[in-house]
Curated annotation (Swiss-Prot):
This is cAMP-regulated phosphoprotein 19-A. Interacts (when phosphorylated at Ser-67) with ppp2r2d. Residues 1-37 have a biased composition (Basic and acidic residues). It comes from Xenopus laevis. Residues 1-54, 78-117 are annotated as: Disordered. Protein phosphatase inhibitor that specifically inhibits protein phosphatase 2A (PP2A) during mitosis. When phosphorylated at Ser-67 during mitosis, specifically interacts with ppp2r2d (PR55-delta) and inhibits its activity, leading to inactivation of PP2A, an essential condition to keep cyclin-B1-CDK1 activity high during M phase. Pfam families: Endosulfine. Changing S109A: Does not affect phosphorylation by GWL. GO terms for molecular function: phosphatase inhibitor activity; protein kinase binding; protein phosphatase 2A binding; protein phosphatase inhibitor activity; protein phosphatase regulator activity. Changing T99A: Does not affect phosphorylation by GWL.
Length: 117
């Protein structure tokens, strides 16, 4: 029985090799056109940095859809450039609930109210 198994395996392998050779000979039309173009223009190929068009567009800078997009991008740049001011206040809010005695006295207004009169 082992002899029969070896024979069937050998037949399967040989048929697989024959099928592969047939597939290699039958080339799709796209592949044949690609081979012709590569033979005609050997210098053309995928460039590592992308296409020239893409590189040129990236060097030009960003284009904006409308003035709103431009203003939003401009505002983001300003926010990044502004240094964050350290808070000078040493008060910590939320430690206790204020009572009327804790609140500072209200300063009198310089302008007299029309309702008080």
């Amino acid at each position: 029985m082992s002899g029969e198994n070896q024979e069937t395996k050998a037949q399967e392998e040989s048929s697989a090799l024959e099928q592969k050779e047939i597939d290699d000979k039958v080339v799709s039309p796209e592949k044949s056109e690609e081979i012709k173009l590569k033979a005609r223009y050997p210098n053309l190929g995928p460039k590592p940095g992308g296409s020239d068009f893409l590189r040129k567009r990236l060097q030009k800078g960003q284009k904006y859809f409308d003035s709103g997009d431009y203003n939003m991008a401009k505002a983001k740049m300003k926010n990044k450039q502004l240094p964050t001011a350290a808070s000078d206040k040493t008060e910590v809010t939320g430690d206790h609930i204020p009572t009327p005695q804790d609140l500072p006295q209200r300063k009198p207004s310089l302008v007299a109210s029309k309702l008080a009169g």
